[in-house]
């Protein structure tokens, strides 16, 4: 399949917004702000920026290089550079990882849609116990979560079958600006609440006394996972880049957008939480239990405004989830239609149906039945563990070794400098990082997940 009939991004802004949309996800909302607030505020953010420069951006550029050079799905892109060696299996690992993540990530994405519906219907009003029970009852229901998982897959499927320009790029040009507009509206509303300044201070006041080994390790982990490295998304989208795309500048712009969304999410969450004396947590419980309670209390005197803010928040989450799901879906769609030599619609249908089945089983494992739990862990949690803690760091680690030590330096330099049309002053630094620094940092991230450093 040639590059001409694969499609490509039609504009620079479309390329940036689509790829940034793949990186921006629910983790920007439920993980980064909490981590920043707990681990030194602006001090953590500075450490995180350093981690992005040392690890996130070099890894992203590496996947850009492999993807654009291959001009094909992720597995084939690695195969083209591997010359028949075992390195090709790194590409297949990324496709497999993306496939598994697509299935269970859609479950949480479906929860966001359910909460949009619940906000519209006013179902989230009540005391903290009611809201907590609402989430528990919904997530363990055998029907509704599966229904919403299928719903978000159908939305994603509709985008994907329209191709790169007519689907992914066109949708991203709408959804990413909408995401920022919604973020800004909620940030303004939250910051106007009484005692909101305490929440802003919690997030942004630098406390360098908290900066220790764990802060550095957590910042490294966040910078790695937030860039969507190791799951094929970056490599697949890069296969649609033109030869004129500046890979370093694109990676820098995407990382800035990703950080900006995360910081704005913190400015949305903490002022509202502190205004009612609630201590925010992280993970799904933050967005599906804590924040509905915060909105109920913070806007108790203005129920209509509270209804609007709650609705906008879950629309925002749904948009963030959908842009990530689109990139994951495309990893697998491009793989199936190119490797099986079928059209895009058939490839997308294979992904939608198979991943919806995976999602259904993952959803059912969260309380509807105990037959989908193994060794005390639900199937959903097993998918999260295997992909997040093993496959992603392994794929990232091997990609650094592959590009840094196996792929001919001239190929890497040609891609980095757009075949000599860019000066490429930073190429030497990039190559040093990807050969010697990034593999070590990813290995530290891997060990830290298992509590090796305490």
Question: What does each model-found stretch correspond to?
Answer:
Residues 1-3, 76, 109-140, 240-244, ...:
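Helix-loop-helix connectors at the membrane interface of multi-pass transporters/channels
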Residues 1-30, 59-64, 68-81, 85-92, ...:
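Membrane-interface "cap" regions at the ends of multi-pass membrane proteins
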Residues 2-5, 9, 169, 173-322, ...:
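Membrane-embedded translocation segments of transport machinery
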Residues 3-7, 34-39, 69, 74-93, ...:
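Inter-helical loop and helix-membrane interface segments of multi-pass membrane transporters/permeases
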Residues 8, 14, 22, 146-147, ...:
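Loop-to-transmembrane helix boundary motifs in multi-pass membrane proteins
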Residues 8-19, 44-47, 86-99, 146-152, ...:
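Select transmembrane alpha-helical segments in multipass membrane proteins
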Residues 11-51, 238, 249-252, 256-259:
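Transmembrane helix-boundary motif of multi-pass solute transporters/channels
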Residues 378-402, 423-454:
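A generic transmembrane alpha-helix motif of multi-pass inner-membrane proteins
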């Amino acid at each position: 399949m040639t590059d001409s009939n694969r499609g490509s991004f039609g504009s620079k802004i479309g390329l940036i917004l689509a790829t940034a949309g793949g990186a921006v996800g629910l983790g920007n909302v439920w993980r980064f702000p909490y981590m920043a607030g707990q681990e030194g505020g602006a001090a953590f953010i500075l450490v995180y920026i350093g981690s992005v420069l040392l690890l996130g951006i070099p890894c992203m550029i590496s996947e850009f290089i492999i993807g654009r050079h291959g001009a094909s799905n992720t597995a084939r892109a690695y195969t083209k550079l591997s010359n028949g060696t075992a390195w090709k299996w790194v590409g297949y690992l990324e496709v497999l990882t993306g496939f598994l993540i697509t299935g269970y990530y859609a479950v949480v994405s479906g929860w966001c849609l359910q909460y949009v519906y619940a906000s519209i219907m006013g179902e989230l009003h009540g005391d903290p116990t009611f809201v907590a029970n609402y989430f528990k009852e919904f997530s363990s229901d055998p029907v509704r979560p599966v229904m919403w998982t299928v719903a978000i897959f159908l939305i994603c499927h509709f985008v994907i079958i329209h191709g790169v320009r007519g689907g992914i790029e066109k949708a991203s040009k709408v959804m990413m600006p909408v995401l920022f507009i919604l973020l800004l509206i909620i940030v303004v509303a939250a910051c106007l609440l009484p005692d909101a300044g305490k929440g802003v201070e919690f997030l942004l006041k630098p406390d360098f006394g908290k900066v220790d080994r764990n802060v550095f390790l957590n910042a490294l982990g966040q910078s790695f996972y937030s860039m969507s490295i190791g799951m094929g998304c970056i490599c697949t989208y890069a296969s649609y880049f033109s030869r004129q795309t500046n890979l370093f500048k694109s990676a820098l712009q995407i990382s800035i957008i990703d950080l900006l969304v995360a910081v704005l999410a913190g400015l949305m969450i903490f002022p509202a939480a502190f205004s009612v004396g609630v201590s925010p947590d992280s993970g799904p419980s933050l967005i599906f239990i804590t924040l509905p309670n915060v909105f109920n209390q913070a806007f108790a005197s203005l129920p209509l405004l509270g209804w609007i803010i709650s609705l906008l928040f879950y629309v925002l989450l749904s948009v963030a989830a959908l842009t990530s799901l689109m990139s994951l879906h495309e990893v697998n769609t491009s793989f199936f239609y190119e490797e099986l030599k079928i059209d895009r619609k058939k490839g997308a249908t294979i992904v939608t149906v198979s991943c919806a089945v995976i999602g259904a089983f993952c959803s059912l494992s969260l309380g509807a039945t105990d037959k989908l739990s193994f060794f005390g862990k639900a199937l959903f949690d097993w998918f999260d563990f295997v992909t997040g803690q093993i496959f992603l760091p392994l794929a990232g680690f091997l990609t650094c070794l592959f590009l840094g030590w196996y792929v001919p330096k001239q190929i890497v330099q040609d891609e980095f400098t757009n075949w000599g049309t860019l000066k490429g002053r930073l190429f030497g630094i990039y190559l040093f990082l990807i050969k010697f620094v990034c593999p070590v940092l990813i290995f530290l991230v891997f060990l830290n997940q298992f509590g090796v450093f305490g």
